[in-house]
């Protein structure tokens, strides 16, 4: 054994694993860090004081493995070096439909640090690959560019696409536009796929820079336009687990819909308490039930009973492992991919009416001013007295006589809930929580599963009442685990970053609005802004820009508060049937209850509680945040597809809308009735040169003074629908804004915007090249009425003509196609 053994903190582990151990990976990395120079294998062998051929071979294998995993880089001088010392970056590939790609550094959540990979660097890469790249300068547009060093981990999972057979060759065009390669399929591996079928494939050969990729068909999904196909594509494209492993099927095989009598023992009996569930009409899994009563001295006592999933789903079981893998249920417009099997999610765990169910209860006291003055958690058994809907409760509160008579025993309790809600709402407003009134839409399907209509979802007081009750239970639960210093996941929403905040303030300034609070505005400052825009016709668009300026909420083991709700602590407790973080919190709370009562056994309790480490929570936080984003991306993609399918029947129609977003290549219009967005491309506007003003969020015509600005009311004609790229193209018919001649103010603003953009470009070019560019090197900032050379929905200025088979592969309908997104 070498003399370095006593210095290696992992020497014992290595000695357990190998007869003739060598230094651990961790020690080698630390050694090279201290050495601060690349070293070849022989020098390392001597420096680590290793001996003999066996240890030399062991070192060779370890260094190769560390190189493979991206921990070390083997340089051209035959030396091993640390990637960070060579300014190399590890990250995930994000493909682009035009053929190039980006590498997002590991751990980064936004695109600010992304590195561009040119087209030729992407020939052997696929969206989702984990790679090592070396920055190699900037491109002509000032974007950081990189060179592929090594693929550290190939994208796992399968690819969905359309199958084609031409000139004796079979190939698949991926449905995901971020995968730019057509995949060649040997004819004996097509699995019976027919021309135009949607198929699932696996890559069998990554190919080279001169030869394309190859794969095999593993599943034929069916015809492209079959009902529900958009959901099946999204499930597989986003790698959402949707089939139950055999071990899970075996574990739930013996379950029935009746709670075993022994499971009810030792619990608080709440079956006589008139708890009710209040959900949407389409709900099938009922997580929560509520009951409220007034206190004699003022204020209220509130019971929030939540399905006790942790009793049935124990740590480290097959059910638990699959729940971790899924992270959450995914709700598509016409299908649900549940986190738990249906026998649990819709049966044994669901708080269905008039049946006994196990539950976790958060019993709270609320003061007359809406403050949470006390809480306690316990395990109970309950029996829901009614399955109510938001619509029914709203109508009962509005005085519907028939419903009030049908539920007369529950009406007083519902009215008490409503009184408490009004006080809670006032308290929420007082603390400065930001309340958004965004419009959500709902797809109405006919018997053939085709879209019949798209309708807005109306939120009434019943929705908000339940929301406030759930928020209160989440606050109480977060307070409990924080006070006990128990490892759990918090729902964290951080304040906006400086760059986005500045951009949002510039936008508000153009509208004559202001966000107070200086460099660190509080939630109250945002809430005051929301009050200012309450009656404005462009309220929804301002809210959209506000949301874009915000960071995304995540799950984290470290509590950093919830900015949007203006809370110091917050966690998810109320939906364990459909969210894994809630299940983790239930286990932690059960452990604390058992610990207080002396019933815990080491890290676990008899009824499903468990004590996790903070390292465990770090892992679960990343996993659950990822699965949440995955679900959001998949459902948004399906929603966009369905909107395009619906709009195919409206091509040629003229509809009212509002300018919802402005870019350098045109502006997006949101239809007033349908809440669907489409693009009015700059090339379809009146013949003029248009300048993009990013601060004012507008396009300004140079010659005739035409202005197209965020929030303008317009009428558009549906020009084309592209199902492939989920794009809808509009043509402007008329606008509420009048032309303003030469428009001195408009031209002044455009000149300012152009000068600012020119200054930024000069600075970027000078920074990249070390000298100022010549006049001939600068591109004009004028946008002509053509498809511009820009990202987004525009085509590159210089590209090869598309291949004939590619055009055929992309066609799915007879509608006009325009790949400009």
Swiss-Prot record:
UniProt region (Disordered), positions on chain: 739-821
Enzyme Commission code: 3.1.13.1
All copies of domain RNB, residue ranges: 267-593
GO biological process, one term: mRNA catabolic process
A Gene Ontology molecular function term of the record: exoribonuclease II activity
Primary location: cytoplasm
UniProt keyword Hydrolase, yes or no: yes
EC class of the enzyme, as a word: hydrolase
SUPFAM superfamilies, alphabetized: Nucleic acid-binding proteins (SSF50249)
Residue ranges, compositional bias (Basic residues): 795-814
Catalytic activity: Exonucleolytic cleavage in the 3'- to 5'-direction to yield nucleoside 5'-phosphates
Annotated NCBIfam families: 3_prime_RNase, PRK11642.1, RNase_R
Family from the record: Belongs to the RNR ribonuclease family. RNase R subfamily.
Function: 3'-5' exoribonuclease that releases 5'-nucleoside monophosphates and is involved in maturation of structured RNAs.
Protein name: Ribonuclease R
Source organism (scientific name): Vibrio cholerae serotype O1 (strain ATCC 39315 / El Tor Inaba N16961)
């Amino acid at each position: 054994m070498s003399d370095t053994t006593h210095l290696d903190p992992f020497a014992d582990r290595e000695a357990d694993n190998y007869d003739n151990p060598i230094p651990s990976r961790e020690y080698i990395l630390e050694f090279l860090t201290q050495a601060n120079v690349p070293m070849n294998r022989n020098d390392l062998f001597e420096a680590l004081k290793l001996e003999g051929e066996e240890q030399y071979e062991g070192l060779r294998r370890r260094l190769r493995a560390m190189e493979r995993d991206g921990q070390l880089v083997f340089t051209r001088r035959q030396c091993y070096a640390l990637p960070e010392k060579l300014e190399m970056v590890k990250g995930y590939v994000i493909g682009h439909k035009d053929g190039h790609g980006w590498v997002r550094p590991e751990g980064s959540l936004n695109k600010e640090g992304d590195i561009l990979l040119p087209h030729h660097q992407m020939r052997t890469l696929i969206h989702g690959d984990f790679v090592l790249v070396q920055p190699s300068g900037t491109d002509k547009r000032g974007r950081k560019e990189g060179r592929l060093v090594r693929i550290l981990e190939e994208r796992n999972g399968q690819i969905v696409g359309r199958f084609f057979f031409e000139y004796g060759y079979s190939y698949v065009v991926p449905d995901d536009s971020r995968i730019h390669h057509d995949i060649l399929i040997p004819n004996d591996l097509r699995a019976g796929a027919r021309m135009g079928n949607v198929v699932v494939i696996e890559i069998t050969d990554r190919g080279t820079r001169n030869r394309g990729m190859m794969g095999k068909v593993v599943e034929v999904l069916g015809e492209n336009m079959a009902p529900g196909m958009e959901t099946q594509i999204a499930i597989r494209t986003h790698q959402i687990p949707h089939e139950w492993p055999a071990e899970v099927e075996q574990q739930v095989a013996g379950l029935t819909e009746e709670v075993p009598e022994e499971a009810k023992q030792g619990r608080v009996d709440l079956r006589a308490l008139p708890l009710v569930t209040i959900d949407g009409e389409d709900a099938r899994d009922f997580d929560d039930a509520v009951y409220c009563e007034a206190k004699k001295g003022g204020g209220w006592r509130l019971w929030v009973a939540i399905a006790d999933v942790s009793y049935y789903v124990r740590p480290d079981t097959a059910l638990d492992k699959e729940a971790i893998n899924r992270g959450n249920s995914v709700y598509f417009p016409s299908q649900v991919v549940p986190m738990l099997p249906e026998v649990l999610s819709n049966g044994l765990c669901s708080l269905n009416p008039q049946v006994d169910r196990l539950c976790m209860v958060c019993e709270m006291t609320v003061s007359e001013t809406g403050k949470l003055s006390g809480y306690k958690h316990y395990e109970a058994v309950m029996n829901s007295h009614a399955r109510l809907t938001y619509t029914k409760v709203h109508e009962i509160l509005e005085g519907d006589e028939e419903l009030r008579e049908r539920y007369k025993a529950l009406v007083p309790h519902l009215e008490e809930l409503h009184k408490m809600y009004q006080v809670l709402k006032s308290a929420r407003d007082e603390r400065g929580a930001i309340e958004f009134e965004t419009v959500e839409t709902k797809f109405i399907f006919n018997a053939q599963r085709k879209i019949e209509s798209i309708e807005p979802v109306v939120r009434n007081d019943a929705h908000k009442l339940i929301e406030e009750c759930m928020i209160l239970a989440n606050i109480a639960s977060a307070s409990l685990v924080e006070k006990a210093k128990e490892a759990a996941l918090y729902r964290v929403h951080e304040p906006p970053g400086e760059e986005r905040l500045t951009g949002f303030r510039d936008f508000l300034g153009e509208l004559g609005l202001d966000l107070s609070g200086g460099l660190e505005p509080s939630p109250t400052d945002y809430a005051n802004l929301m009050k200012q825009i309450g009656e404005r016709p462009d309220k929804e668009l301002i809210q959209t820009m506000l949301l874009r300026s915000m960071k995304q909420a995540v799950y984290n083991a470290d509590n950093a508060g919830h900015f949007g709700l203006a809370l110091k602590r917050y966690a998810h407790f109320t939906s364990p049937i459909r969210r894994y973080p809630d299940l983790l919190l239930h286990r932690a709370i059960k452990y604390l209850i058992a610990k207080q009562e002396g019933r815990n056994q080491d890290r676990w309790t008899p009824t499903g509680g468990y004590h996790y480490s903070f390292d465990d929570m770090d892992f679960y936080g990343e996993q659950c945040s990822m699965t949440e984003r995955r679900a959001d991306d998949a459902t948004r993609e399906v929603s966009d597809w369905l909107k395009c399918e619906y709009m195919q029947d409206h091509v040629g129609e003229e509809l009212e809308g509002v300018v919802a977003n402005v870019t350098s290549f045109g502006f997006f219009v949101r239809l007033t009735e349908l809440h669907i967005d489409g693009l009015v491309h700059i090339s379809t506007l009146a013949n003029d040169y248009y300048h993009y003003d990013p601060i004012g969020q507008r396009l300004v015509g140079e010659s005739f003074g035409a202005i197209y600005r965020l929030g303008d009311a317009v009428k558009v004609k549906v020009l084309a629908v592209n199902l492939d790229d989920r794009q809808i193209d509009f043509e402007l018919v008329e606008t509420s804004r009048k032309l303003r001649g030469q428009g001195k103010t408009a031209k002044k603003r455009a000149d300012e915007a152009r000068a600012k953009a020119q200054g930024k470009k000069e600075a970027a070019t000078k920074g990249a090249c070390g000298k100022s560019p010549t006049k001939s090197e600068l591109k004009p900032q004028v946008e002509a009425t053509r498809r511009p050379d820009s990202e987004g929905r525009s085509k590159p200025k210089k590209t090869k003509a598309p291949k004939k088979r590619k055009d055929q592969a992309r066609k799915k309908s007879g509608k006009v196609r325009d790949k400009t997104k």
